[in-house]
Amino acid sequence: MNVFCKIILPLLCIISCSERKEIEVYNMELDENKKEVLVEIRNNTENNYYLLSPIVSIMTKHLQDIGVEMIEGQIHHKKLDSIVCSVCIWDDICKEEYYAMREIVLLPKKSVKKIKYKYDSEEYIEIETVHIGFPYNGYYNEIGKKMQFMLKKKLDSSNIIKGYEFYNKDIETMTIKM
């Protein structure tokens, strides 16, 4: 019993604690009556972070992609957008003819953030999947990693959103299959 308490219990604690992600998609729900998707993202860390443009996509049974817009849980910041455009020149939002601002989602430490998305469809559609992805997180090729490193460095040094830093690590996506 003594060996169990001294060796096995601490080992089990280390394993269970290490499996918890820093930032994770905690829950995702589709409300077909309201035509909304609720996403809950949990920050398990002691730091305040923000995410850039988490994207929900909805695919129908006929492989049609439905437009989805974030309607709750975000802020916008013009200076932050210009910093992102100075690094991510490939981004469509940075093109002059296409003006929009990125959604910024604040994730206070040790909390769950709720984000709502709305989709528009005049007729009834059969939804196949609902998916959330993170376009500014978790690059695997060298160019993407360098761009991500430069973006984090520029955003964090600018301290645009006081008390928060840009979260650029990989976040596991979530997909609901209907």
Regions found by a protein language model. Give the residues of each.
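Bacterial Sec-dependent N-terminal signal peptides
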Residues: 1-26, 39
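The feature marks short-to-medium sequence segments in extracytoplasmic or secretory-pathway proteins
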Residues: 51-107
